């Protein structure tokens, strides 16, 4: 047992790859992927937005990613009320008006609209469950609800792409 303690200490001291983010490596990977993958081979449905609406929608999606990161950080810090507040304000049903969802939904196919609605409803559901976790201390239901939110994101991004 004593032989394993230094090894465990070393493992904890070395940062894992999952915690590190190297933007240059990501850009290299994306460049290589773009060169080897023709857009014609992209099986996702192309959704055409007016340029200004496309930029607005992409900015909203980037904000969604940032909100998900903030939610995960709040969960890691056991700040379940903060996680709930971010989820509802930035991703939940409350966020629909702030993000101009009604305007952009006019350009979306029904499946894309459904995935977006599922994400927003799921985020509001997560917010309620996270608030419960702040009282009960039970985090598993909140983590499961957050996974459902991410599932809606994955579903949409797997099926659709903007032009």
Regions found by a protein language model. Name each.
Residues 20-77, 81-163:
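Sequence context surrounding c-type heme c attachment/ligation sites in exported
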Residues 10-12, 75:
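Generic leucine side-chain signal with a strong bias for well-ordered alpha-helical environments
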């Amino acid at each position: 047992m004593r032989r394993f303690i230094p090894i465990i200490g070393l493992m904890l001291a070395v940062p894992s790859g999952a915690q590190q983010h190297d933007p240059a490596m990501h850009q290299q990977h994306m460049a290589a992927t773009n060169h080897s993958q023709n857009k014609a081979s992209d099986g996702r449905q192309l959704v055409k937005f007016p340029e200004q609406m496309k930029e607005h929608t992409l900015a909203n999606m980037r904000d969604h990613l940032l909100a998900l990161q903030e939610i995960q950080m709040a969960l890691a810090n056991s700040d379940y009320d903060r996680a709930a507040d971010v989820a509802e304000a930035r991703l939940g049903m409350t966020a629909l008006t702030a993000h101009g969802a009604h305007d952009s939904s006019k350009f979306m196919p029904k499946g894309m609209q459904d995935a977006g609605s599922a994400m927003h409803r799921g985020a509001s559901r997560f917010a309620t469950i996270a608030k419960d976790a702040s009282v009960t201390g039970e985090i598993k239901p909140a983590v499961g609800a957050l996974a459902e939110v991410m599932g809606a994101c994955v579903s949409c991004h797997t099926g659709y792409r903007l032009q």
